[in-house]
Amino acid sequence: SKGEHFISQTEDKSKWAAAAATYKRIIDMGQYELHTVAKIVNDKGTGTLPLPTTVSSADFPDGAGDIDPYKSYRSVFDGTYQPYSVKEYIYYCRRSDGDDRLYFPSGIGGNATFSVTQDMIDEYRMADGRAFSEATEAEKSYKAVGSSSTFALEYQLSSNRACRDDNREPRYYATIGFNYCIWPGTSYRGTENLKNREVTYYEDGNAKDASNNNYRNRTGYTCRKYIHQEDIGHWNSTKKSKVFPLARYAEVLLGYAEAMNEMDSESFTDEKGNIIQRNPDEMVKYFNQVRYRAGQPGITIAEASDYETMKKLVKHEWQIEFAFENRRYWDLRRWKDAYDAYNKPIRGLDVSAKMSQREQFYTIRVWNTEVYMKRMFSNKMYFWPIDRNVLQKNGKLVQNPGWN
């Protein structure tokens, strides 16, 4: 080019105001709401987990007192409900079962190759809302908890699980498969011992395919977000039909809070004459709906009033609430955070350790032994290159920076 920017280099807060106004119109329609499942109460100790004292016990949406946060979040994705009954969905598509094999361990019909990085795992908070980095050394320990439990009538926690996988927020259990995680597979009708499989990712564990070393997990964690309790990757079984949410109401709530935060102290008037300005009360009200549905503490007016604090909270919530929903790729780019995020080494547990080497297994290491584990990002990658054939057809076009 002639030194002219094709994209304005001047920040325009009115665009955030327009986004906030659009999100608020969707909220005010009253057509959508966060999906929730009622609290489960029984005398067997297998119902809804007690709320930490840091989480409001008021009824939803002012707290999480009358809902089961684990089932409320999990059932948005696992096919428990027909899509027409989930008011959170704004737009969705039918989902293929093909990628389930990436999640399932080899022993129950998968190849266990979907590996979640340690950086992602460490973003999940403790049940009481503390960051994992604020957990005690005992809570971060590799040692076995030593006792089993069941909650939400269906989720079983093995006594062999590490302390670091205990007492985490409900979305952790709804989303992550970890070492000694139990995969129910209740629809299995065969004679093999495949139901309630306690999966391990050790070198000699039961998650990998002994005949093909490529079919194994690389970090010791996988994704279970789209796996129903009935699902199992075996022909003598069934799988729940599922949809993939392309847009859901939680996006509207987080988007509204983010847009209001980015307006700073300026105020704007929309085409209908409405005044749009940063409102911490509104930010807290709608942001906290997402937090309460997840069984997490709400944020305060003081936190919402501080721009940098709120920005960090918003980014964290986007990352966890929308984990493995094809959002992170775009969020990192629109925030211009991709360079830092992708130029970090991939970390995970030491899956080369054997079952007799438990402490070594839970030692966090950098995985860079295979080509596809080495990732990089340069600033030119914020834009895609223009195809050479297109450039040759139109001499007035200019290649995007860095792609010459």
Where do the language-model regions lie?
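Structural register within alpha-helical repeat arrays
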Residues: 2, 249, 256-258, 263
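Acidic, mature catalytic/reactive cores of soluble proteins
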Residues: 3-7, 170-176, 334
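Long, intrinsically disordered, low-complexity segments
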Residues: 20, 43-126, 130, 203-206, ...
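Flexible, polar/acidic helix-loop-strand segments at domain edges
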Residues: 87, 99, 107, 147-249, ...
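Extended, non-transmembrane interaction/recognition domains
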Residues: 135-146
